[in-house]
Every structure is written in structure tokens, then in C-alpha cells.
Amino acid sequence: MSFITRRAPSVRLASLLALAIAQLSCSRTAPPPADTHAGVPLRVGISFAASQSSKPLDGRVMLFLSTDSTHEPREQISDAVTSQQVFGVDVDGLAPGVEAVVSDTVLGYPERSTADIKAGDYWVQGLFHVYETFHRGDGKTVKLPAGDRGEGQQYAEAPGNLFSKPVRMHIDPSSTAPLHLVLDQTIPPIPGVPDTKYVKHFKVLSERLTKFWGRPVYLGAILVLPEGFDTHPDAHYPLAIYHGHFQPDVSDFRETPPDPKLKPVMMDSIIAQCPNGHEGDLCTKFGYERLEQEKGYEFYKEWTGPGFPRVLLLIIQHPTPYYDDSYAVNSENNGPYGDAITYELIPYVESHYRGLGARARGVYGGSTGGWEALGVQVKYPEDYNGAVANCPDPIDFRAFTTVNIYRDGNAFVSEGPWRTTPRPAERDYFGRTRVTMEQSNQKELVLGTHSRSGGQWDIWEAVFSPVGADGYPKRIFDKRTGVIDPTVAAYWRDNYDLVHIMQRDWATLGPKLRGKIALNVGRSDNFFLNDAVYLAEDFLKGAKNPPADATVDYGARDEHCWSGDHANPNAVSRLTYHPRFIKQLAAHWLKTAKGDTTSWRY
């Protein structure tokens, strides 16, 4: 789960000031087109240069306004109250030099219209999120961002997207003089990550996904080999699979000591200001980057040292046109990612790197990865032996964050006979609302229509919803009004509500899941994910014939993403997933072994 927009490399103040001086003339093209809209409120025309593409393009054209000069405007859109401003408009077949127009009728976030912008000077930037046309195997034709450009479905970082350099401009909503931006920059390709003695990177062509998407689709893999892999040619190994958001390389594994030039770790400040490790610049300010490198190097030394379980560690790269991650299950909109991972990628890894197979294969992850860990264990109960799901995305849709999609009529507000109350989407440590459901979904609608924002609510629709007549996911709720569609909710329940599925099918699932499930979550999870875990615990504790033998643990006042570590804050424990959960899974495999338990224990 992620409501945080990740930043590309930042542009600092000095660079922006230089750009402002050098490119102030770019605030209007030279010469500007004749003004045929006299008397019309503010209009901003955005075009791209023929030097960037000689052909017409489809996609989403975005206009960014910012009061903050420390980062590029395209990097500053988020659910936080500090978010800067964005507007977005769909374009089909936009030719070079032809403008997409942002006017007062175009939806924005946080302000809904250009008419609501306060007159003043802003850093201004345009971006074209380029779409590809897919002729899918289900007969649908859709226009979506390419899912395999190496950035993990991030519009501000996606290679091939067009943008303009930030420029300082005066914006006045009452002005009738049109403004113009030219997108004359292209985000370059992302270089590959080199292999090392222990870490291997490769891709596997998926026949299933290729058939669905109508063009070649690959699954990426980052594989960490155990110490002694080459010197023990007869050994066969368990497979520990880490699920989570897209990453270009294995995180929290560093083969060299920390960079001595980094800021020292200020642990007291990290605990106070960066308690969960994902508070952005606050973490960097207090030496968090060094802490990350320290923990990564500690894990490397443990991995290669005596006594650590000798296993294969697999991190899967499976971004889709809708998100940085497929959720590792089959979907009408994403395609058969569950089968592709389980029956194509994993067998390839195990056959080429001496894996032991299903009885010594387990999964772990947090947030999105937590849902995936439980999801694949439930969907493929005999193909995985053990799942550790930390702060999982909603695993019971009676607690779809703050919404019961089966009972509630509206996702944005709780409704009474005389009033409505806005629903929170995120809270802080004290329970105070950071962003509402309506605000978070408004942001996504501005970034992309038809579930194409690359955001959290949209990927849930892309994974869980049936495909609509237009080829795009059916909405679980109206993105502007919040009204829930009960027919879509019923489809979600029958196919992806993991607690409901376990309850419904326990007679057959129970014997295959017994003893395999571990859940961890903080009781103050920022996204209310603990509520669904409570409901899961109610079922798992009461399950009979057979009993579930599951474990459920809670962090007393811990936030997102608490993972069962009672001794350390989230900012630290999130960096120790691999050693903690590999050991936990290895102990489970030895306890339930039906095969080789000796060749890999050296």
C-alpha cells in the first residue's frame, strides 16, 4: 500500500533560479498564437516539440504549480497537506505543436479549478504521461501507460514521458491572456543494475501475460544466492519470496560498508520525526540513509556468515500498466499474474538455481506485499508453504480501510438521517485525519481517468474489479461522488475478499492452510489496516475442522507498517524483514518438511 508519490532526483533552488532566468521566455511561445479567446478565464496551452516526437501521442497531459522551489513540481503531488497543485486532461492523437488546454473546467487537485488558484508567482511545469495502445487477448482495446519501463509505474519518472523544465510564472485566474508551455524534454531510459557474486537480475517471458496483453510481457526477478552456492553443487534450496512495491535492486542488502560521507544516524530524532521510515525528507535530515546502509550491510554479513539459513531469496518485479505491482493474483484487468508468477517464473527460478519446490517455498511482505503474501497463500494453498503478512492491504472488505463496501452506500462520507461525516483515508499517530477519502480519490482522478493514475485506490479497482464494457476496470465507487456500486462490491467479495474466501471454502482450504498464516499489524496503522486484521483474527481463532493454527500479533500503538518487532521502531524494523522472516519461514519448513532438510543446511 502506498499513498506517497515517490520523487525523482530533485532539482535544487540554484538550478531552478537559473532555469527561470534562462527560460522565462518559455512562459509564452514566441510568437504566441493569436488569442481567439478574449474574455475567457485563464487558459494554459501545453504542447510538445516535434524534436521529442514526430508522431501524434495519446496520454494524460498534466500541469503542475508549486510554491516550493526545492523539488520539481512534478515530484510534489501527494496525499499530504503539503501537496502542490496539479491539473490533468486526457488527449488522443495529440500532434506535435498542437496544444492541450487546461482551463477552468479541467479538474485539479487540491484546488478543483484554475479559477480557485490565488494570483501569484509559481513554479510551473508540464508533463505528458504517454500511453500505449494494447489490443488485449480478451478482445478489449485500451490505452494505458506501459508497465515495463523500469521505474515502477511512476509518471514523474517514466522513461519516454515528456516534460518541460520548471519555470517561474505569474498566474492570475482573472487574466484572459493565454499561457503556453512547450514540453521539450524526455525522461531518459533507466540503466540496468549490474549483477554481483550474490545478486542476479533477469527477466522471463510470460506466455500467459503475453497472450493477455497482446505483446511480449516479461516478469523481472532479483535473486540473491546463498553463501556457498557454487561450492555446494549438490545442494538444493528453499525459496523465500519477498513481495512488495517495485524495486530496481534488492533493498536492505549491501555488499560494501556504509558511505562514510553520509550524515550520522540521529536515532532519537528518527524515532521522534521519522518513526516509520517513510516520512521523506525528514528521514534524510536525520541520517536515515546511513541507517539503511548500515542495516543492509549487517544483513549481508549475516547472510554470508555462519548459521544463517541457506536459501534462495527472490524479489519479483511485476509492474503493470495500472501500478508498480500486480498484487500477484489473476485479474480481469491486469491479466493472469498469479498464474504467471506461480507457474512460469518460480518454476524457472527453481529449475535453474536448484530450488526444492512447493514444500520449501514461502512468502512474506508488508502493506501491498502483506496482502500479496496472504493472497497467494490463499489462492494457491498447495504451491506455497508459509505466509507472513505484515500490515496487509484490506484482507476483509467489511473494513476496506474506513469503508464497509457491503453495507455502506458511500465511500466518501458516513451517512445519517440529517448529516454526513467525511471519512478519513489516513490518520497520524494521534488519530488525526491527514487526508479524506474524497481528497485522495480526487488526486487520483486528476492524475488519470479509467483507473490510470498509478495510485492506490485505482490499483485496487484494477485488481479486484470486473472489466467494464469499455475495457477498463468497473468502479467500486464513483470517483466524484463516492457512491458505491453493490454489484461490483459483490464481485470483489466473491473473488478477492480473502477472509470471506477462507470462511466460504474452509472445508477444502483449511487442511491446506493450517499452520501457514502469520499476520502482524499495528493497532494505530495510518491507513486503518488493523481493522480488517481484527476481522481475520475473529475467523482464524474460531476456525474448526481443522483449526487454523495461525498467529496474529499487534503493535500496541504502532503505525504503518508494523511487522511484529516489539523491540524496535518501525523505522528500524522495516529494514530487517529479510533476516527476520527468512529465519521464521526456515523454521516452519523444517517443522513441516517432506523432503530434503540436509543439503542446504551447511
Show where each model-derived region lies.
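Bacterial N-terminal signal peptides that target proteins for export
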Residues: S2-S15
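C-terminal motif of bacterial Sec signal peptides marking the signal peptidase cleavage site
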Residues: A22-S25
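Bacterial signal peptide processing site
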Residues: S27-T29
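Low-complexity, Pro/Thr/Ser/Gly/Ala-rich linker/spacer regions in secreted
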Residues: P31-A38
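Contiguous beta-strand segments within globular domains
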Residues: A38-F48, S54-V61, Y218-I222, I241
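Non-catalytic cap/lid and distal C-terminal segments of serine-dependent acyl enzymes
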Residues: S51, T67-Y602
